[in-house]
Amino acid sequence: MDYFTLFGLPARYQIDTQALSLRFQDLQRQYHPDKFANGTQAQQLAAVQQSATINQAWQTLRHPLTRAEYLLSLHGFDLASEQHTVRDTAFLMEQLTLCEELDDIEQSKDDVRLESFIKRVQKMFDARLQQMVEQLDNAAWDAAADTVRKLRFLDKLRSSAEQLEEKLLDF
């Protein structure tokens, strides 16, 4: 059973996150291992396994990138373990430039420039995310997989910038 079916949701990117949360809570109550404490060892093991599956499904579906990766996996794209890389040279050059800029910001400890950088990267991420949503809605699986790969780069860059921000604030 796929994660969308487990939560009673249609297998698509845009989901009702409130329904996801409510169903998660219901499933957790229903399959909590403590409810099976007096059951057989097989029942206890099954409850632990089901609870782990529910938690994994929840973690996967609640985050936009992992939800997209999972949806793509249902259509034959195993992005989590693939060695396929982004082949868009212009995008890769842009990422290299952004990484160098972040290094410069770190060296100069320029928090104003960092704030501007974070906003710019967030705008880039949001634009790519919207592009991915449209591709997934239109079942353009190859294009969506490529966009997810690019979103990973941007997400990593955004995370690095936010870590630098925390580091600079500690001074």
Swiss-Prot record:
One of its GO terms (molecular function) is ATPase activator activity. One of its GO terms (biological process) is protein folding. Gene3D superfamilies: DnaJ domain (1.10.287.110), HscB, C-terminal domain (1.20.1280.20). InterPro entries: DnaJ_domain (IPR001623), HscB (IPR004640), HscB_C_sf (IPR036386), HscB_oligo_C (IPR009073), J_dom_sf (IPR036869). The keyword Chaperone applies. Keywords: Chaperone. SUPFAM superfamilies: Chaperone J-domain (SSF46565), HSC20 (HSCB), C-terminal oligomerisation domain (SSF47144). It comes from the Bacteria. Residues 2-74 form the J domain. GO terms for cellular component: iron-sulfur cluster transfer complex. CDD domains: DnaJ. Interacts with HscA and stimulates its ATPase activity. Interacts with IscU. Belongs to the HscB family. Co-chaperone involved in the maturation of iron-sulfur cluster-containing proteins. Seems to help targeting proteins to be folded toward HscA. This is Co-chaperone protein HscB. It comes from Salmonella choleraesuis (strain SC-B67). The gene is hscB.
